[in-house]
């Protein structure tokens, strides 16, 4: 609820109000009437309602000339509303906005810096290549403006205009002005200039030598880092991460200067700082690493107290960094324990981090994690339980001692008998443990004893990889299974319906055991694999086995092929290749770090989807604008059935009975400009056009009713308060 004094002011203001109010329906006819009202407050209310309808997705572009008439005011709030309307249609309806370019040029010379800023920003958003002929002089003036707020906006406009016509931007020299802005005294200007140069470099790598610019301005970036806003810091830190230090002293200096930002409240700033530190960490001495690692560890711990979405991004980046520095967070294992209110995507990432963090030489830590994972495996979310079971086997394989592996095996066997829905995951994990300890017959007998009790394994096991592991176990330990042939026959009968991994495993198992099985089983599976399957790998493997069995020394040859044991599993955790890891470390905090897919060509062929009108003369653009407004003037007829009567009554009471297209001709005294030297002439026309506006005010374009508006007098004070920040 607003304060009492504001409510009293609003009550008094509404009590003595003479100007008619705008209803909440938002009909175009009523808005059009309000926009040309003789009362300033009514016009302002109509603009607000128009903006409201625009934000709701309604097309109010037919009100463009009526809205733009109200730009001639000293009320900063009203002018900002008009500019907000114009900017909304600048990209989608550029042919409309180009007609008001003279008004923007006039505002670009306004004494108020906020208005100058809005004018140059709006002009740069008009997606028409002809705008460059009119924006050159205002842009150069604002690039060297005395006010930093205007300069920081102007440097962004250069990148937008470069997208329209890069050749002309280079010819005009505004790119050079943008490079000179890197030496500006204001840190926000430096940050925006850097962002604009990066965008230009992405559009055309030959336009600017970004690497040399970064190298020559590292000191400026480091000085500006502590004085700019958080989003400007992200830009500067991202730029510093692209720089390779010359020696260990410079790398140490960069790390020391950015380390303070590890404690920033914005997680994006923290990740950008970590990226800079990781980039320079290999170049500094090993003795300094321990202190930096502690600070990095504290930063990651703080990220675990952020909202779940930010935690997810942080966990993905931690996963990359742990591969390079596995000892980074070994003492912070408990921070990554799953909480009851964590969303599923965070839970899955935390389990992966836990298994990677645990120290295999620390039995106590491994035992605590084993107990924690056992609890996770008894939860109700299928994906979470599946990942916890997989983590149990990964933990047993990572610790490597058979006594600890036996504990993991007992937990998995207990889970296997408890619930049918997790049999697939338990089967896969148990087979991984047996491959990790191939010589442990006791463990093999334990596992086979449980599987031996299954009467219909093809029904209990659902996934292809689980069936593949089960059939592999039949071939590896045939003596531990009773009625082996019937168990294999079940899979032969469903051979065609099985997937590729199960078919391949069944083929290899039968060939391996063909001496102890009946001959018809081998014949059947070879025929099925060569004639019935659509998997090329299975068919080729079956053809190879068939030819080997047809050779004179087939037994010894088949034994050589099948009796070799699979290598022992030493680690089931996925790892990046060295090349991919180095690329991902360079892209921390980006979308590449989330998908683990480095975007090596992100600076090559970056495409920009844009709505740019090119090759049109001013006369053509004016005709396009008139046709568009004319076609949309009565778009709401189908919904507002009484609109014709309302419009008739309204027009009878209006002082000016100009039509919509006539308003366009009177409002925009806009002649074609073929050269940038005619801009001063156009400025004069624009000022004269504004003076001739009939808005119920004096010849200066300021309504006489503005004196009754309490907000008008305070507009400049508010804008000055904002500008004092710069």
From Swiss-Prot:
For this UniProt record, the keywords arranged alphabetically read as follows: Cell membrane, Coated pit, Membrane, Protein transport, Transport
Cellular location of this protein?
Cell membrane; Membrane, Coated pit
Could you tell me which Pfam families the record lists for this protein?
Adaptin_N
Coarsely, its chief localization is membrane
Return the SUPFAM superfamilies for the record: ARM repeat
Instruction: Extract the coiled-coil ranges from the record.
Output: none
The record ties this protein, via InterPro entries, to: AP_beta, AP_complex_bsu_1_2_4, ARM-like, ARM-type_fold, Clathrin/coatomer_adapt-like_N
Tell me the GO molecular function terms: clathrin binding
Question: How the protein sits in the membrane?
Answer: Peripheral membrane protein
Does the record carry Protein transport as a key word?
Answer: yes
Could you give a single Gene Ontology term from the biological process aspect? vesicle targeting, trans-Golgi to endosome
Record keyword Protein transport present: yes
An example of a Gene Ontology cellular component annotation for this protein is:
AP-1 adaptor complex
Q: What does this protein do?
A: Adaptins are components of the adaptor complexes which link clathrin to receptors in coated vesicles. Clathrin-associated protein complexes are believed to interact with the cytoplasmic tails of membrane proteins, leading to their selection and concentration. The AP-1 complex interacts directly with clathrin.
Q: How does it assemble?
A: Adaptor protein complex 1 (AP-1) is a heterotetramer composed of two large adaptins (gamma-type subunit APL4 and beta-type subunit APL2), a medium adaptin (mu-type subunit APM1) and a small adaptin (sigma-type subunit APS1). Interacts with CHC1. Interacts with APM2, probably forming an alternative AP-1-like complex.
Give additional notes from the record: Present with 2690 molecules/cell in log phase SD medium.
Q: Which family does it belong to?
A: Belongs to the adaptor complexes large subunit family.
Its protein name is: AP-1 complex subunit beta-1
What organism is listed for this UniProt entry?
Answer: Saccharomyces cerevisiae (strain ATCC 204508 / S288c)
